[in-house]
Swiss-Prot record:
GO cellular component, one term: membrane
Source species: Zea mays (Maize)
Taxonomic lineage of the native organism: Eukaryota, Viridiplantae, Streptophyta, Embryophyta, Tracheophyta
Subcellular location: Cell membrane
Pfam families recorded: CASP_dom
PANTHER family assigned to the protein according to its UniProt record, in alphabetical order: CASP-LIKE PROTEIN 5B2 (PTHR32021:SF0), CASP-LIKE PROTEIN 5B3 (PTHR32021)
Glycosylation sites per record: 39
Quaternary state and interactors: Homodimer and heterodimers.
Protein name: CASP-like protein 5B1
Length: 154
């Protein structure tokens, strides 16, 4: 049971963390390049959530790299408990932020037609940021699932 792909201290775990970080950073960059995103709460929440996700995944990615370099085992009950809680919290926050941002984008484009009426509104960038947030969430959810599975098998 302990040989699950993506467990901490392995190259699979490092790849999951790298994917989380890359897509969170891409979402932040896409949103930050959109002028006026601070006028909408859902987009500010997306940036805050992706910032937290990027910091969490960067920290655990560094820990995975350290464990890989020194061949350390990170499967200890206390560490796994912290990983599970952190991964579950960041996965839930990422999903909520991605859904809220995507909901506002749908409102702008399909319901209120604000994107057609106001060509200055960067709807395409909002869409890209929400899409990257969903991709970040998929990596985060996979990591949370792996960590929960590993904690249950200890």
């Amino acid at each position: 049971m302990t040989e699950v792909a993506g467990r901490p201290g392995t190259s699979g775990g490092l790849a999951l963390r790298a994917g989380q970080f890359v897509f969170a950073a891409a979402s932040i960059c896409a949103m930050a390049s959109a002028p006026g995103f601070t006028n909408y709460t859902a987009f500010c929440y997306l940036v805050a959530s992706m910032g937290l996700q990027a910091l969490w995944s960067l920290g655990l990615g560094c820990l995975d790299y350290y464990a890989l370099t020194l061949r350390r085992d990170l499967q200890q009950a206390l560490l796994m408990s912290l990983f599970v809680v952190g991964d579950c919290v960041t996965a839930i926050l990422s999903f909520a932020a991605a859904c809220s941002a995507a909901g506002v984008v749908v409102l702008f484009e399909r319901d209120a037609y604000l994107c057609r009426r106001d060509p200055q509104l960067p709807c395409g960038r909002f869409e890209v940021a929400a899409a990257f947030a969903f991709l970040c969430w998929t990596f985060s959810a996979a990591s949370a699932l792996v960590m929960s599975w590993l904690l249950a098998s200890l």
